[in-house]
């Protein structure tokens, strides 16, 4: 088929605005799936995606549409994740398209991720077609959304297509708009091969498979290809496209979207954003914008209950084959035994990894408090160390010249009645207000700069509970900044517990330490000897609690008689408890670790 009849597009939307349903309808309308294959969220293949109603992995589907002008067009739909953790993947998917459908829920209006993804599409020079979805809902307010499209995004509201993916309204109009408004791909099949990888997955039979958009040249089985970021070479075994099923083709040429399999053993060799070219006749320039995946949040994952360290290691290895964004290294802790320090893209990514490990690989795990990467510059040296684990943070504050932590720009869109409490929350989280505007009389747009460490614990839950679920937010990394941070260590009977170290802001240290000590007092069971809980900052104790010992009634067998007899027995007991305290070990239950994660 000629290149002028090809269209590459993606759908961008906030979580839950009906993206996957619209994709299903387009596939049905163009006959890509038969009646028999219909099911909800056809492109969301992971269990987690279906249950949470979110898209994590991307898919790229080919379909054919006979337009009103009598020509048949080849359409490639690239489905993108909507969540902030996967923003780099979204940017690569947009780079593979010429146009985008911007989907907006008629009852919710424009939300934070709508705006964030809209600007990403504008940066890539895509043609944007606004679609107002869910117009069949009783709460739909189309005029309000049109006004927002004009005022917030600066698009012509009359160009917006009214649709309901669920009822199948407006689907033909959308397909006509894709054909008429989105330009065909430019590219020269005669030039050397240049293909952008925008997703990958692991197939037990084909090895690691790359989903690509071909910009120049063509590729067929038997070709020798090279990955430009690593210089590794492979021989192509199969090329094809998803028509939702994986379908083999003889070749892929300029303008096409499809997959390349080359019996690559490790999915990590296929990096999202990398460029594939021919080994013998490579292209001069790779596709711009490649970045290796960079974890923002780290946490310790340890085996729990009857899972062994080996089982956890095998599960992580298998999982990492499919998720190139995760990094992990072994670590051990006297309190929790052997485990791993794992890096994630963000909090949602972390939850999904935990859930998939437990569900798909059957391991039971315990996760320590998530933390970000701090940069510590020591005095008298030029070296800056990256601290991924609070245990590695230097104890002696006198040796530290400065500490930096990652900051993010948070954008929040909320109904106006919740503005007060949300501003208060952002101030508690050390946020600095940068902008506040009214999108319409009832909706407010806020911008804050705040530390990532404040967001990763409970910011999402708090914002949703304050606004009864109506507010939405999005954040992007803006760089490292100096902060007044200190390390707190928990001592139990004067012995430090490594897994209970925290890095907190100096202003909060006192309050935080007190809460930790109280929580531990509630969760550590009473022993036969007194337990002292202390929270120290640089060797100085700033909060402490004690758990009284259990004791037998040693004077029960004395009937009357001399008081000195009772005194002697009590003195003996006291001596025994003292010795016990010296040599006794306190076993910390798992609840003790978990309770401290929830401390504010």
Swiss-Prot record:
What is this entry's stated membrane topology?
Answer: Peripheral membrane protein
The yes or no answer to whether the keyword Nucleus is present is: no
- Record's subcellular location: Cell inner membrane
What EC number(s) has UniProt assigned to this enzyme? 3.6.5.n1
Question: What does the record give under GO molecular function?
Answer: GTP binding; GTPase activity; ribosome binding; translation elongation factor activity
Alphabetized UniProt keyword annotations: Cell inner membrane, Cell membrane, GTP-binding, Hydrolase, Membrane, Nucleotide-binding, Protein biosynthesis
Q: Which GO BP terms, alphabetically? A: positive regulation of translation
A Gene Ontology cellular-component term? plasma membrane
Is Transferase set as a keyword in this record? no
> What residues does the tr-type G domain cover?
4-186
Q: Which reaction does it catalyse?
A: GTP + H2O = GDP + phosphate + H(+)
**Which positions bind GTP?**
16-21, 133-136
SMART domains, per this entry? Answer: EFG_C
- Which PROSITE patterns does the protein's record reference? G_TR_1, G_TR_2
Q: Which InterPro entries match?
A: EF-4, EFG_III/V, EFG_V-like, EFTu-like_2, G_TR_CS, LepA_C_sf, LepA_CTD, LepA_IV
Q: What does this protein do?
A: Required for accurate and efficient protein synthesis under certain stress conditions. May act as a fidelity factor of the translation reaction, by catalyzing a one-codon backward translocation of tRNAs on improperly translocated ribosomes. Back-translocation proceeds from a post-translocation (POST) complex to a pre-translocation (PRE) complex, thus giving elongation factor G a second chance to translocate the tRNAs correctly. Binds to ribosomes in a GTP-dependent manner.
Q: What family does the Swiss-Prot or TrEMBL record give for this protein?
A: Belongs to the TRAFAC class translation factor GTPase superfamily. Classic translation factor GTPase family. LepA subfamily.
Annotated protein name in UniProt: Elongation factor 4
Q: Which organism is this entry from?
A: Aquifex aeolicus (strain VF5)
